[in-house]
Amino acid sequence: MSDIEQRVKKIVSEQLGANEADVKNESSFVDDLGADSLDTVELVMALEEEFDCEIPDEEAEKITTVQQAIDYVNANLK
């Protein structure tokens, strides 16, 4: 597991109150981890803070799974 993958999963588990072992790459924030719209906004903000990046709203709307979050961070890290 890459450092980025590990950090994303840690943030997801902390933000959504999920057990880290339950946070899989294919996990959907809403369907599998029980996130609501406020949770997803807070999750995006936490990712932005952790990785010192800005995720535009239109991009954030496309990030619905753990893997998509990992891929976005990998592609957009400075």
UniProtKB/Swiss-Prot annotation:
Its main location: cytoplasm. It comes from the Bacteria. InterPro entries: ACP (IPR003231), ACP-like_sf (IPR036736), PP-bd_ACP (IPR009081), Ppantetheine_attach_site (IPR006162). One of its GO terms (biological process) is lipid A biosynthetic process. Residues 2-77 form the Carrier domain. The modification O-(pantetheine 4'-phosphoryl)serine is found at S37. 4'-phosphopantetheine is transferred from CoA to a specific serine of apo-ACP by AcpS. This modification is essential for activity because fatty acids are bound in thioester linkage to the sulfhydryl of the prosthetic group. Pathway: Lipid metabolism; fatty acid biosynthesis. One of its GO terms (cellular component) is cytosol. Keywords: Cytoplasm, Fatty acid biosynthesis, Fatty acid metabolism, Lipid biosynthesis, Lipid metabolism, Phosphopantetheine, Phosphoprotein. GO terms for molecular function: acyl binding; acyl carrier activity. It is found in: Cytoplasm. Pfam families: PP-binding. Belongs to the acyl carrier protein (ACP) family. Carrier of the growing fatty acid chain in fatty acid biosynthesis. This is Acyl carrier protein.
